[in-house]
């Protein structure tokens, strides 16, 4: 999860987030090299006294500055398209969870189980226990099995919301009347925090999301106790 004065991204917990972090580093390196080159050229233009006043055209240079940016854009676009495809693809999910956004809480329904559904509200600051996080803890966590593909169906009952868990690389809009899909996969157990990431009203800041990723055996015990 995030911590005060953090500069980088949160630690990746899913294969998708690992790919996104690699793509971020790849793109940042390209942007840094281009920026350095542009600043170097500008500094030369400001400091040198040599000018080419008689130059009418330079086809070779024009060809280079047309082809080179196109090649750079392709180097950025290809990994991006690959990750977009990976984010939309889901093969044989072991579990489907329907997520509904409300003003201002989330409700969850495990569609593979009968009568396994609950609402998830933020715990008020006055009710927090020692060690719990302000504005991030909920009364009912979403318990899911780790290392398995899980399909999340996301929608809204009222206004636009956005279901986001940064460490898993997830951010999916919850739109009234529309059903969006996301894939959840975690490489390790633990608690993973997120929040509504779309302005949805006065209590928008009080819609936390908590995923508890556990081994399959513990998930089966939890689901049996909830039914």
From Swiss-Prot:
Q: Which residues lie on this side of the membrane: Mitochondrial matrix?
A: 46-59
Cofactor binding description? Binds a dinuclear copper A center per subunit.
Indicate yes or no for the key word Mitochondrion: yes
Q: Supply the SUPFAM superfamilies for this chain.
A: Cupredoxins, Cytochrome c oxidase subunit II-like, transmembrane region
- How the protein sits in the membrane? Multi-pass membrane protein
> Does the keyword section mention Cytoplasm?
no
The Swiss-Prot or TrEMBL record lists the needed cofactor(s) as:
Cu cation
Q: Which GO terms describe its biological process?
A: ATP synthesis coupled electron transport
Q: Where does Cu cation A2 bind?
A: 196, 198, 200, 204
- Kindly list the residue ranges recorded as spanning the membrane: 15-45, 60-87
Functional note: Component of the cytochrome c oxidase, the last enzyme in the mitochondrial electron transport chain which drives oxidative phosphorylation. The respiratory chain contains 3 multisubunit complexes succinate dehydrogenase (complex II, CII), ubiquinol-cytochrome c oxidoreductase (cytochrome b-c1 complex, complex III, CIII) and cytochrome c oxidase (complex IV, CIV), that cooperate to transfer electrons derived from NADH and succinate to molecular oxygen, creating an electrochemical gradient over the inner membrane that drives transmembrane transport and the ATP synthase.
Description of how the protein assembles with itself and partners: Component of the cytochrome c oxidase (complex IV, CIV), a multisubunit enzyme composed of 14 subunits. The complex is composed of a catalytic core of 3 subunits MT-CO1, MT-CO2 and MT-CO3, encoded in the mitochondrial DNA, and 11 supernumerary subunits COX4I, COX5A, COX5B, COX6A, COX6B, COX6C, COX7A, COX7B, COX7C, COX8 and NDUFA4, which are encoded in the nuclear genome.
The identity of this protein, by name, is Cytochrome c oxidase subunit 2
- Please name the gene that encodes this protein: MT-CO2
């Amino acid at each position: 999860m995030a911590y005060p004065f953090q500069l980088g991204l949160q630690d990746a917990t899913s294969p998708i987030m690992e790919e996104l972090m690699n793509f971020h580093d790849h793109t940042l390196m390209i942007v840094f090299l281009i920026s350095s080159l542009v600043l170097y050229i500008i500094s030369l233009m400001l400091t040198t006294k040599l000018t080419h006043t008689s130059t009418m055209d330079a086809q070779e240079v024009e060809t280079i500055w047309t082809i080179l940016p196109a090649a750079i854009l392709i180097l950025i676009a290809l990994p991006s398209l690959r990750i977009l495809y990976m984010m939309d693809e889901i093969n044989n999910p072991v579990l489907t969870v329907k997520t509904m956004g409300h003003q201002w809480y989330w409700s969850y329904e495990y569609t593979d189980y009968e009568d396994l559904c609950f609402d998830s509200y933020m715990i008020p600051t006055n009710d927090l226990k020692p060690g719990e996080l302000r504005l991030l803890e909920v009364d009912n966590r979403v318990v899911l099995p780790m290392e398995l593909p899980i399909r999340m169906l996301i929608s809204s009952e009222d206004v636009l919301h956005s279901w986001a868990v940064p460490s898993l690389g997830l951010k999916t809009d919850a739109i009234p009347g529309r059903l969006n899909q996301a894939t959840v996969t975690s490489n390790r157990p633990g608690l993973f925090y997120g929040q509504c990431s779309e302005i949805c009203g006065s209590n928008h800041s009080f819609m936390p999301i908590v995923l508890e990723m556990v081994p399959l055996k513990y998930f089966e015990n939890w689901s049996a106790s909830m039914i």
